[in-house]
Amino acid sequence: MSWFSDHGVELKIEDDGRVFPVSNSSSSIIDCLMSQAMKIGVSLQTGKVVTTASASSLGKFLLKIEKRTIDYVEYVEADYLLIASGSSPQGYRLVAQLNHSIVDPVPSLFTFKIEDPKLAELAGVTFPKVKAKLKLENVRRNIPQLTQVGPMLVTHWGLSGPVVLRLSAWGARDLFSLGYEGILIVDFTPDLNMEDVKSILSQHKLQFVKQKVLNSCPSEFGLVKRFWKYILNRESLVEDMLWASISNNSLNSVASLLKHCSFRVTGKGQFKDEFVTAGGVPLSEISLNTMESKIHSHLYFAGEVLNVDGITGGYNFQNAWSGGYIAGTSIGELARVTDLEERVL
């Protein structure tokens, strides 16, 4: 973080620990990185693909490079090779060619598809703080991280926001095996216990007996009118009912729904909107202090090509940058020492 601040990109930390540029624009990060790369003479070649990679008996790496648009082939011999190809299938193919194993990649950090037409009508409604628990069939082990607290957003196809993205990250592999089906239980009043919610509803009923229930939602809940209407509809309460006509049983049912509102997850976001991938090169096959392969000397990995995936909020970027920094400095130091030794000889 200090590196970006020192290079002109101011950062901010959200209440839930997520880190973003103050500009709220990813281009601030991209422009900073590109600017620094150009300053130190990095050669950036685009429109090319490394199609094959092999290790020679002399400790070199033989690379076949092709252009995407024309019939062009180039062969390069490299002293060092750093694979930082993200979740690109081509990157995984290079990994396999170099005899590394791959943990099957699955999507992570995605939104939840909820087939609920009434919920879809609320697209754009945000909740600053909810407590959400993801229940997955046949997953009996206790996974504390499948309960998360944070902001949530209603979309045209379901639910999104930091709390949902974190749940998708912790449940990525189980969700994949279950066809992205499960039950999401949301507490819309996480700072109030059940008895508090019941008491607030009862007091509100006494205070606003002659008002329509739709037009008078307890302010303590912090809910927008559109969502309050959704809650009432789920409890089959007629919108023009007066508070005076609502039974205590109905009040208890509303309280239960606010504290334990269940949604059936039927898939992940419809636009292939996952941000990262879980899976990749096992960490057991690299030396984390240098990011060097344990199979081939002078072969390095960094970023999402490794079996590492973080929650939302900058953690995956940090993993890529930290791993890239370690790998780059390791290569630089090794090359410097090798150069000195060759000069001595």
Task: Pin down the residues of each PLM region.
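Residue-level recognition of phosphate/Mg2+-coordinating polar/acidic sites
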Residues: M1-S2, D6-G17, K64-E66, Y80, ...
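Short beta-strand to alpha-helix junction loop
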Residues: D16-S35, Q45, A84-G86, Q90, ...
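Glycine-rich loop(s) and the adjacent beta-strand/alpha-helix scaffold that form part
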Residues: E77-E121
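A conserved FAD-binding loop/helix module that cradles the flavin
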Residues: Y80, A84-L98, N307-D339
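Extended, Lys/Arg-enriched charged tracts that mediate electrostatic binding to polyanionic substrates
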Residues: P117-R140
